[in-house]
Amino acid sequence: MKKIGIFAKVHEEPLEMADQLQKWLVNRDIEVVRRESSPPVLDVTQSNPGHAPADLSCVIVLGGDGTFLSAARWIGNQEIPILGVKFGAVGFLSETRKQDLYPVLESVLKKDFTTQTRTRLLATVREDEKIITTQTVLNDVVINNGTLARLANVNTYVDEEYLTTFRADGLIVATPTGSTAYSLAAGGPILEPQVAAIVLTPICPFTLTNRPLIVTDTSTICMTLAATAMDVTLTFDGQAGLKLNEHHTITIQKAPVPTIMIKVPGQSYFDVLKTKLRWSGGKV
């Protein structure tokens, strides 16, 4: 490996480790590209996150899941492997702990590692047939009501067939990776990362029969808002947002390029799941 990216959360501890890691890599004749996380963007149409250099061998993420999602957004549609190092409180996306980083990196530099692909979603927003933005997400696309105590009526179609109108505080469309994020908090199911599916989870639905729904990842999901919509926002992985109105149409489908995650030997997805959700014997 000749060139590695370091993507760090803007916080004292991750930044200190980024400095140490950069020196460690440079001493091994490896070029380093540094990038730091930035606050969420309120209007995605006015932002340009830039892209990681195409010749990066991998990207090391120092931070929590939010930082990992920012790094995935920076990498974009490039097949650059990501290694997450846990600094946050949950860390579903982090593959190793900070105290284990250097032994893991020794293996990575020797190319002694495996990877796992994670499905992403491609979301296209149109306003009166004009494309406003196209975004790719690793976790989820979320329609969310604002501060006013009003329901968002989300007309939902699957493969051009009308499904229902969700009367709820919002609607989450998540990947299997995103099923352990906002969707889980809203009562959605947990999907193993390799399951070929997309999850639709309503947020606090007014109708009790509006339950989470799992569809195949070959499906195309289309959503519009009722004309009475007020103060409704669309967010992409919690990193960028866009104000919605009844003239917008949101189309979501599986993205052509997945995210590639570096895997640490001896650690399974269910090991991580049990630990994070305290299923390993402790009280929840």
UniProtKB/Swiss-Prot annotation:
Keywords: ATP-binding, Cytoplasm, Kinase, NAD, NADP, Nucleotide-binding, Transferase. Pfam families: NAD_kinase (PF01513), NAD_kinase_C (PF20143). GO terms for cellular component: cytoplasm. It catalyses: NAD(+) + ATP = ADP + NADP(+) + H(+). NAD(+) binds at D65, G66, N139, D140, R150, R167, D169, Q239. The keyword ATP-binding applies. It comes from the Bacteria. Transmembrane segments: none annotated. Its EC number is 2.7.1.23. The active site is at D65. Its cofactor is a divalent metal cation. Signal peptide: none annotated. GO terms for biological process: NAD metabolic process; NADP biosynthetic process. Belongs to the NAD kinase family. Involved in the regulation of the intracellular balance of NAD and NADP, and is a key enzyme in the biosynthesis of NADP. Catalyzes specifically the phosphorylation on 2'-hydroxyl of the adenosine moiety of NAD to yield NADP. This is NAD kinase. The gene is nadK.
